[in-house]
A protein has these predicted regions:
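Non-catalytic effector/regulatory segments
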Residues: 1, 35-36, 69
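Arg/Lys-rich, positively charged N-terminal/basic patches that mediate binding to nucleic acids
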Residues: 1-28
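Residues that recognize and position ribonucleotide moieties
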Residues: 2-3, 55-57
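ATP/adenylate-binding site constellation spanning eukaryotic-like Ser/Thr protein kinases
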Residues: 6, 51, 79-82
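Residue-level signal for pocket-adjacent positions within structured domains
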Residues: 11, 38-41, 80, 84
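Enriched for short, Lys/Arg-rich terminal
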Residues: 15, 21, 59-63, 67-90
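Conserved short hydrophobic interaction patches
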Residues: 27-31, 82
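A short, surface-exposed loop/turn module that caps and links secondary-structure elements
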Residues: 30-56
Length: 90
């Protein structure tokens, strides 16, 4: 699947530790190689009526948040530790 990133996502990714940046890179390679959301590991739709088309992927204690756009591309919005991730996303 194709994806684009927000400025906030790029900034948050730069602030990750080296180990978590490597894990994120592996996850992004997996995203590029998959064809459907159901093939992404640990991917779940966000709950709530205002969160339609918003998803998160769990990797360790970190979460990657994205929105599925109408053309089928993923818009990566945020990445960060589980604790405060859900306060910021979506």
């Amino acid at each position: 699947m194709n994806y684009t990133t927000s400025a906030h996502f790029r900034k948050a990714a730069r602030q990750l530790s080296d180990e978590n940046r490597k894990r994120l890179a592996i996850l992004l390679n997996t995203v590029e190689e998959t064809q459907t959301l159901s093939n992404l590991p640990n991917c779940k739709e966000m709950q709530g009526k205002n969160n339609k088309d918003y998803y998160r992927i769990r990797f360790g204690n970190y979460r990657l948040g994205f929105k599925l756009q109408t053309d089928g591309t993923l818009f990566l919005i945020d990445v960060g530790p589980r604790g405060d991730f859900y306060n910021r996303f979506p």
